[in-house]
Amino acid sequence: MNAYYEQDADLGYLQGKNIAILGYGSQGHAHALNLKESGLNVCVGLRPDSSSCDRAREAGLQVNTVAEAVKWADIVMVLLPDQYQKAIYETEIAPNLQPGNTLAFAHGFNIHYNQIVPDKSVNVIMIAPKSPGHLVRRTYTQGNGVPCLIAVHQDATGEARQQALAWAKGLGGTKAGVIETTFKNETETDLFGEQAVLCGGSAELIKAGFETLVEAGYPEELAYFECMHELKLIVDLYYEGGLSRMNFSVSDTAEYGGMTRGPRVITPAVKAEMKKILEEVQDGRFAKEFIDECNGGYKNLNRLRAENSGHAIEKVGSKLRDMMSWLIKK
């Protein structure tokens, strides 16, 4: 895959255009402030009763309702939760889009699964920073940026790709590198990673390790330290230098034990289940299940949240984290 940098992007494709950022959460505040400080004309679209209105105004941003922001804008970036985008698109975005406008996203879920089907007269693009919003913002203020993905779903004006690259540049992304992909590939890999590794797989691995030690008679505190707390040390090594950096940094005992016992935990059967999970993402079964869950009032999700919050690892973890003065309590 090719990477694009500063010389490959031209902010001129966004200059003189009105840009609306819908949402002012983690990504929304970073997009709005970075683009504004890159010299672009930005407003934020929010519900009138949103708690984010005051924060956005205090940051020097113009704030409108979603409908007003879209009507004013040439380019609209939708940074709202996936489950709310369809309804807001149908009631407040679509009626106010004009031919030649650009509709932008930071994640492809609603476009890829046809929850949102824009008119062919508008550009549809994606700019997806591969970092949380606070890091997108912080690196920009330091004169750097984070890697970004871009994609084009519809090019009505012939400038969609150039606009996506320019947006990434406005965020600071071209200083790190921008990779072009598709809505399909971004969406499917993102969902799979969350489910099988980042949020689903890792959480279940942690709980299983904790339970194994506790059921064998070891104190919950030690089980927490070994299976939850110390994971950050290892993940930081992965983050900085991959698997090799981790293996180089740990003891020979840990390296040998991990290499010989790890495959007994993540067996071919686990990988086979991962493939099933990927298939559910690819064929839309997961998307339908999630949409039905949202429409049904989150009954299953709320039950699962309650079960997880009541797990023993959460109770002992809360006590142990109180001992860690360096942690910011939330």
Swiss-Prot record:
Superkingdom as given in the UniProt entry: Bacteria
GO BP terms: isoleucine biosynthetic process; L-valine biosynthetic process
Alphabetized GO MF terms: ketol-acid reductoisomerase activity; magnesium ion binding; NADP binding
Residue positions binding Mg(2+) 1: 190, 194
UniProt cofactor(s): Mg(2+)
Binding site for Mg(2+) 2: 190, 226, 230
Residues covered by the KARI C-terminal knotted domain: 182-327
Cofactor binding: number and manner: Binds 2 magnesium ions per subunit.
Domain KARI N-terminal Rossmann stretches: 1-181
Recorded catalytic activity of this chain's protein: (2R)-2,3-dihydroxy-3-methylbutanoate + NADP(+) = (2S)-2-acetolactate + NADPH + H(+); (2R,3R)-2,3-dihydroxy-3-methylpentanoate + NADP(+) = (S)-2-ethyl-2-hydroxy-3-oxobutanoate + NADPH + H(+)
Catalytic residues (UniProt): 107
Residues annotated as binding NADP(+): 24-27, 47, 50, 52, 82-85, 133
Annotated metabolic or biological route of this protein: Amino-acid biosynthesis; L-isoleucine biosynthesis; L-isoleucine from 2-oxobutanoate: step 2/4; Amino-acid biosynthesis; L-valine biosynthesis; L-valine from pyruvate: step 2/4
Annotated EC: 1.1.1.86
Keyword match Calcium: no
Primary enzyme class: oxidoreductase
Function: Involved in the biosynthesis of branched-chain amino acids (BCAA). Catalyzes an alkyl-migration followed by a ketol-acid reduction of (S)-2-acetolactate (S2AL) to yield (R)-2,3-dihydroxy-isovalerate. In the isomerase reaction, S2AL is rearranged via a Mg-dependent methyl migration to produce 3-hydroxy-3-methyl-2-ketobutyrate (HMKB). In the reductase reaction, this 2-ketoacid undergoes a metal-dependent reduction by NADPH to yield (R)-2,3-dihydroxy-isovalerate.
Protein name: Ketol-acid reductoisomerase (NADP(+))
Organism, scientific name: Chlorobium limicola (strain DSM 245 / NBRC 103803 / 6330)
Underlying gene: ilvC
